[in-house]
């Protein structure tokens, strides 16, 4: 594409962008991607295309449960030393890293549905409000807004929505003390959630 742009008088290639993934919990993929992108920038420069910016994308993970993603300082320590000498404008797309913990999905328990094999807490939120659990079984912390006393028995619930779809759940196998009408907070829902 860059070679083709060189042959067109009405277009100018000014930068290169990459996106290597999402919810990354190690700096190694970022370092590897940067090596590859910088090699491409060097190859393009040798062919006469000088770029003015690099967008290193996003993908930096957050802690939903027990993940240990790199801190922003650790992330920067891997990338900045190699970028400083280039004189390129550097863009990044922190996305989830800044948005996830900024949002909470509040939902109400509509009713409890006990069965012989499993207990369900049917809520008024659904997979269309927060797709991560249904799409790839992502863990989301779900806590009662007002915790119940020990007078309310703890049960192991699947937290499910009202959509007529077997994949409509926000959490599975959660030990909670609940009654119909309780408010639940699904934390870390600021990224990829309708909050």
Task: Write out the residue ranges for each language-model feature.
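Active-site loop/helix belt of alpha/beta enzymes
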Residues: 1-112, 170, 174-176
């Amino acid at each position: 594409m860059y070679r083709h742009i060189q042959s067109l008088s009405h277009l100018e290639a000014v930068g290169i962008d990459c996106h290597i993934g999402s919810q990354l919990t190690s700096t190694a993929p970022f370092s590897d991607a940067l090596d590859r992108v910088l090699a491409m920038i060097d190859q393009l420069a040798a062919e006469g295309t000088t770029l003015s910016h690099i967008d290193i994308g996003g993908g930096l993970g957050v802690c939903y449960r027990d993940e240990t993603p790199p801190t922003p300082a650790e992330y920067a320590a891997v990338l900045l030393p190699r970028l400083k000498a280039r004189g390129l404008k550097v863009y990044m797309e922190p996305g989830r890293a800044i948005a996830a913990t900024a949002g909470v999905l509040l939902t109400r328990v509509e009713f409890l549905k006990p069965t012989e094999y499993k207990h369900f807490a049917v809520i008024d939120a659904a997979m269309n409000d927060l797709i991560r659990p249904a799409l790839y079984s992502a863990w989301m912390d779900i806590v009662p807004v007002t915790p119940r006393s020990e007078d309310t028995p703890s049960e192991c619930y699947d937290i499910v929505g009202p959509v007529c779809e077997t994949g409509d759940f926000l959490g599975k196998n959660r030990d909670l003390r609940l009654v119909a009408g309780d408010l639940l907070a699904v934390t870390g829902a600021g990224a990829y959630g309708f909050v």
